[in-house]
UniProtKB/Swiss-Prot annotation:
Record: active site: 12 (proton acceptor)
GO function terms (MF aspect): cobalt ion binding; nickel cation binding; sirohydrochlorin cobaltochelatase activity
Residue positions binding substrate: 73-78
Lineage, broadest ranks: Archaea, Methanobacteriati, Methanobacteriota, Stenosarchaea group, Methanomicrobia
One GO term of the biological process aspect: methanogenesis
Amino-acid positions noted as binding Co(2+) in the UniProt annotation, renumbered to this chain: 12, 78
Gene3D superfamilies recorded: 3.40.50.1400
CDD domains associated with the record: CbiX_SirB_N
Functional description taken from the UniProt entry: Catalyzes the insertion of Co(2+) into sirohydrochlorin as part of the anaerobic pathway to cobalamin biosynthesis. Involved in the biosynthesis of the unique nickel-containing tetrapyrrole coenzyme F430, the prosthetic group of methyl-coenzyme M reductase (MCR), which plays a key role in methanogenesis and anaerobic methane oxidation. Catalyzes the insertion of Ni(2+) into sirohydrochlorin to yield Ni-sirohydrochlorin.
Positions with a binding annotation for Ni(2+): 12, 78
Keywords: Cobalamin biosynthesis, Cobalt, Lyase, Metal-binding, Methanogenesis, Nickel
The protein's name in its UniProt record: Sirohydrochlorin cobaltochelatase
Amino acid sequence: MSEKIGILAIGHGSRLPYNKEVVSEIAATIAKKHPDYVIKAGFMENTLPTVMEALADFDGTGVTKIIAVPVFLASGVHITEDIPEILKLDPETNEGKITVDGNEIPVTFGKPLGHHELLADLVFERAMEVM
């Protein structure tokens, strides 16, 4: 059986709709560029779907592994405590198992965006837009 990967983009969430739109558009762009992967978006607070609801949305997709990636710039309590708890991750390996379609499959958790040259370029681009 070949591996079919699901990617869960995790956003913070907000009472304002723009936050959901941005994270959902990022997930849609990833899906368009990488059609062999199943891409979902979920949110930590104030926005649906929740992370748990987004994980449930992988049912019926045939995924054999899920990679959860926070769409956050830096680590905070959601990254270090809340998301690992939701995903039931082993604190030493950052890996866990979740049930999809009645089967236990591995889930791993990526790092926040952090410093990256592309982000630095984007910040500079945004500055130039208002110059």
